[in-house]
Swiss-Prot record:
Name the UniProt record assigns to this protein: Solute carrier organic anion transporter family member 2B1
InterPro entries: Kazal_dom (IPR002350), MFS_trans_sf (IPR036259), OATP (IPR004156)
Comment text on domains: A conserved histidine residue in the third transmembrane domain (His-128) might play an essential role in the pH sensitivity of SLCO2B1/OATP2B1-mediated substrate transport. Transmembrane domain 1 (TM1) may be localized within the substrate binding pocket.
Region (Disordered): 1-30
Length: 682
């Protein structure tokens, strides 16, 4: 929003343009187009691409969260904190952006913020290049991976550990902390860089677009931007099919498939691609002027659309006024831009207290906090949940979210906006629609408690076998073996449907590779823990109920769609529930509360809940690292239970809002009746 001096300058320019328009001008001169950097339509195109790329780079981490955990040995609590850390930088600067928004060169600030986002993306990929190649077992660097290191060998023949305890404590742990520190720094920079992009871009469009075209431009912008998270999951699905060290593959290749639980995809490659897109999208912003000529004409498309109704001008004004809340939602309006910093600090507490005392505002924001907490946890950990619960690959889990869940959520947002506009819903009707959407979302989540796969038998972990790793039929079958406790090379006894953490723990002494046209299959032989010293296959046991992932994700997606319907009506409740002079602050407070109470803590809460269901942790240098196995039933109950808790909170808040609005309506009706009777008596 321009300040007073800017408005005065623009007003003078408008008067000058009206004077010039009275003079005859050459028709050829009129036909000459303005430069593309003086065209608001080109700015809309550039900003749509930039916000799309920004959401891709910020959402990509969520698509590869389980892969990053495996690569760097992180718990879900730590990875959740990492995913939420970009909110720290964002929150720390958003108030300054709101206050000084009209005092800076907005396009250049957007460009600088985008460059910082790209730098953050490069930093996120940096740990891959400065770390050692990924070793998916504990073989020594000079040995062939996945061979003798995991076999049952006598103590005298066992391969030595690759790292001593001294080197582990002094070198490996330092490198681990360095990698994690780099990623947390990158997430902070990602949040800081994203601060000016959306607010400055939308305010710039609204300032220099024709008042009737502005809602259309912003609608196009939001429609394109909403595809960003879906593309991020799609990109994650593609990248995680590639091996993490695709740029430095070992000479002998690898003996892993994407279905192997030790598989780590090329998580870093998506950050490089997204960062490159952000740099390309940021380049034009350094050539846009601080102020461009105001768009003077309405689009012919809009004229045709609105021709059948009221006059174009009135329709355009109506749409502009209805879209004004969307501008405020993005943090566009500056908080008291005509006040000095000292005056702003004096006024702020009084207005803040007045807004917080409003019951409708408080309840709607609390409901949005619950919904946002549910969304933040789902977006961060649902791919990992699907991987573990249904034994599917990370690539397929991301594909399901990107192609089904996110598109249906976008449809829900659009449907909610259309219902509010077409039906001209009152505040009470908006609250009823929100209540209905929350109720349907809650009901759709009930079957999720019963759709899932139980943890299959894992020798020594999910079976009550005392101290012995082998089945109870063969006690002590792997005692002669010198098995490393922290090794992980899962194998499956398909006859008994029992999984072992390594061939060594199954007592296997031999290894056979069967070559095929498309892939090779590895088997381990002479296994003392298997009936008849039989043969077992490499890899985890396949789940017998993986097919249930489709009805599960369908219910999740339908729930996301009906929950998204409440987005626009709940926002309208905030705008219509506070005083006109407090709307800007109310929207700003809503924005801050959602980030502080939902988007920051929710991934950490969900990650902590997931960690409590772990039954076997990997150990790195004596510390607890990534979880190898979960109790699937407990994981499902706690993850879905947490979602159910937040959905219930949202439902209760909307029910209270509807009850308050009905009470206010009855009181207003009673007052009107009393006033009417008093007038009749007079």
């Amino acid at each position: 929003m321009p300040d007073r001096s800017t408005k005065a300058t623009m007003g003078a320019e408008d008067i000058h343009e009206r004077k010039v328009s009275m003079e005859p001008r050459d028709s050829h001169q009129d036909a000459q187009p303005r430069g593309m950097f003086q065209n608001i339509k080109f700015f809309v195109l550039c900003h749509s691409i930039l916000q799309l790329a920004q959401l891709m780079i910020s959402g990509y981490l969520k698509s590869s969260i389980s892969t990053v955990e495996k690569r760097f040995g992180l718990s879900s609590q730590t990875s959740g904190l990492l995913a939420a850390f970009n909110e720290v930088g964002n929150i720390s600067l958003i108030l300054f952006v709101s206050y000084f928004g009209s005092r800076v060169h907005r396009p250049r600030m957007i460009g600088c913020g985008a460059i910082l986002v790209a730098v953050a993306g490069l930093l996120m990929a940096l740990p891959h290049f400065i770390s050692e190649p990924y070793r998916y077992d504990h073989s020594s660097p000079d040995r062939s991976q996945d061979f003798e290191a995991s076999l049952c060998l006598p103590t005298t023949m066992a391969p030595a550990s690759a790292l001593s305890n001294d080197s582990c404590s002094s070198r490996t742990e330092t490198k681990h902390l360095t990698m994690v520190g780099i990623m947390f720094t990158a997430q902070t920079l990602l949040g800081i860089g994203g601060v000016p992009i959306q607010p400055f871009g939308i305010s710039y469009i609204d300032d220099f677009a024709h008042h009737s075209n502005s809602p259309l431009y912003l609608g196009i912008l939001f429609a394109i931007t909403m595809m960003g998270p879906g593309l991020a999951y799609g990109l994650g699905s593609l990248m995680l099919r590639l091996y993490v060290d695709i740029d430095r593959m070992p000479e002998g290749g690898i003996n892993l498939t994407t279905k192997d639980p030790r598989w780590v995809g090329a998580w870093w490659l998506g950050f490089l691609i997204s960062a490159g897109l952000v740099v390309l999208a940021a380049s034009p912003y350094f050539f846009f002027p601080r102020e461009m000529p105001k768009e003077k004409y309405e689009l012919h498309f809009r004229q045709k659309v609105l021709a059948g109704g009221a006059s174009i001008g009135s329709k355009g004004e109506e749409l502009s006024s209805q879209h004004e809340p969307l501008k405020k939602q993005a943090g566009l309006p500056q908080i008291a831009p005509d006040l000095t910093v000292v005056q702003f600090i004096k006024v702020f507490p009084r207005v803040l207290l007045r807004t917080l005392r409003h019951p409708i505002f408080l309840l709607v924001v609390l409901s949005q906090v619950c919904t946002s907490s549910m969304v933040a946890g789902t977006a961060t950990f649902l791919p990992k949940f699907l991987e573990r619960q249904f034994s599917i690959t990370a690539s397929f889990a991301n594909l399901l979210l990107g192609c089904l869940t996110i598109p249906l959520a976008i449809v829900g947002i659009v449907v909610g906006g259309v219902l509010v506009k077409r039906l001209h819903l009152s505040p009470m009707q908006c609250s009823a629609l929100c209540l209905l959407g929350s109720l349907l979302c809650l009901l759709l989540s009930l079957p999720l408690f019963f759709i899932g796969c139980s943890t299959h038998h894992i020798a020594g972990i999910t079976q009550d076998l005392g101290a012995q790793p082998g089945p109870s039929l063969f006690p002590g079958c792997s005692e002669p073996c010198s098995c490393q406790s922290d090794d992980f090379n899962p194998v499956c006894d398909t006859s008994a449907y029992v999984e072992y953490t390594t061939p060594c723990h199954a007592g296997c002494t031999g290894r056979v590779v069967q070559e095929a046209l498309d892939k090779s299959q590895v088997f381990y032989t002479n296994c003392s823990c298997v009936a008849g010293n039989g043969t077992i296959s490499a890899g985890s046991c396949e789940s017998a109920c993986s097919r249930l992932v489709l009805p599960f994700i369908l219910l999740i997606s339908l729930g996301a769609a009906v929950a998204s319907i409440t987005h626009t009506p709940s926002f309208m409740l905030i705008l219509r529930g506070v005083k006109k002079e407090d709307k800007t602050l109310a929207v700003g407070m809503q924005f801050m509360l959602l980030r502080v109470l939902a988007w920051m803590p929710s991934p950490v809460i969900h990650g902590s809940a997931i960690d409590t269901t772990c039954v076997h942790w990997a150990l790195t240098c004596g510390r607890r690292a990534v979880c190898r196995y979960y109790d699937h039933d407990l994981l499902r109950n706690r993850f879905i239970g947490l979602q159910f808790f937040f959905k219930s909170g949202s439902l209760v808040c909307f029910a209270l809002v509807l009850a308050i609005l009905r009470q206010q309506s009855r009181e207003a009706s009673t007052k009107a009746t009393v006033k009417s009777s008093d007038l009749q008596e007079l």
